[in-house]
């Protein structure tokens, strides 16, 4: 049987669903969703942890046995992102960082120039860097060349729920990548997560689609099932698309 574990850098995870924590109504709701998702890796906005003390969220993740993945959400330049990552390493005792460098607050799209600059500095400083990036195969390759442990292209802008608006680009990123590809941002429902895996992504990272769903725990369970289904379908190999019909049973 094919090993279904997700491996990034020197760590392996049984679940290919990575969860975010933003948007949850409260810790009780978040806990139910995290348990239902089966996730083993969950992002934590280090700026929010600093502002709110963070003990409740971090204690929750520790109790559930979930690895926290600090991110640099809200950073607008390489210098700010690097400093935030260094603070996260000191606070959480981890050299893993989800790197986000945002161009503006309206689109929340990555600033490609500052993103690469920050990635290069963090890799040189010994970080395991997982960058949130545009759905640009050239930029993804540039980040891999910089030493990033994975690339995390968006499906569509953060929080939009628009799904994967450019599946061909995601396929090109997958085809050219020598590191894991994690679909990050834009997931709206379970079919989006399944499609990401069918396109060849190694994992899916999502938050809003679960935390702001009508029933977060139920949606988390649906996302987990969708990621598994998409992964299995990709491994199984879909039939080729045809222009004309073809009978499944031969004529007598």
From Swiss-Prot:
Keywords: Cytoplasm, Schiff base, Thiamine biosynthesis, Transferase. Gene3D superfamilies: Aldolase class I. The gene is thiG. It comes from the Bacteria. Its main location: cytoplasm. InterPro entries: Aldolase_TIM, Thiazole_synthase_ThiG, ThiG. This is Thiazole synthase. 1-deoxy-D-xylulose 5-phosphate binds at residues 159, 185-186, 207-208. GO terms for biological process: thiamine diphosphate biosynthetic process. It comes from Mycolicibacterium paratuberculosis (strain ATCC BAA-968 / K-10) (Mycobacterium paratuberculosis). It is found in: Cytoplasm. GO terms for cellular component: cytoplasm. Homotetramer. Forms heterodimers with either ThiH or ThiS. The keyword Transferase applies. Pathway: Cofactor biosynthesis; thiamine diphosphate biosynthesis. CDD domains: ThiG.
């Amino acid at each position: 049987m094919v090993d279904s574990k997700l491996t990034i850098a020197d760590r392996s995870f049984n679940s290919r669903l990575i969860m975010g924590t933003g948007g949850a109504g409260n810790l009780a709701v978040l806990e139910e969703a995290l348990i239902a998702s089966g996730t083993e890796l969950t992002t934590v906005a280090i700026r929010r942890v600093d502002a709110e003390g963070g003990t409740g969220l971090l204690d929750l993740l520790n109790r559930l046995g979930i690895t926290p993945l600090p991110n640099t959400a809200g950073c607008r330049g390489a210098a700010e992102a690097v400093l935030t990552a260094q603070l996260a390493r000191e606070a959480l005792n981890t050299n893993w960082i989800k790197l986000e460098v945002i161009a503006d607050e309206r689109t929340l799209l990555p600033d490609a120039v500052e993103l690469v600059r920050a990635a290069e500095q963090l890799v040189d400083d010994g970080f395991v860097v997982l960058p949130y990036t545009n759905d640009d195969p050239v930029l993804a390759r540039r980040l891999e060349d910089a030493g990033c442990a994975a690339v995390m292209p968006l499906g569509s802008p953060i929080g939009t729920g628009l799904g994967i608006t450019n599946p061909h680009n995601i396929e090109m990123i997958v085809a050219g990548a020598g590191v894991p590809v994690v679909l990050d941002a834009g997931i709206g429902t379970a079919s989006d997560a399944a499609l990401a895996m069918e396109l060849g992504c190694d994992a899916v990272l999502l938050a809003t689609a679960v935390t702001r769903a009508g029933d977060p725990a139920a949606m988390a369970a649906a996302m987990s099932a969708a990621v598994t289904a998409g992964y299995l379908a990709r491994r199984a190999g879909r039939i080729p698309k045809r222009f004309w019909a073809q009978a499944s049973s031969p004529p007598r």
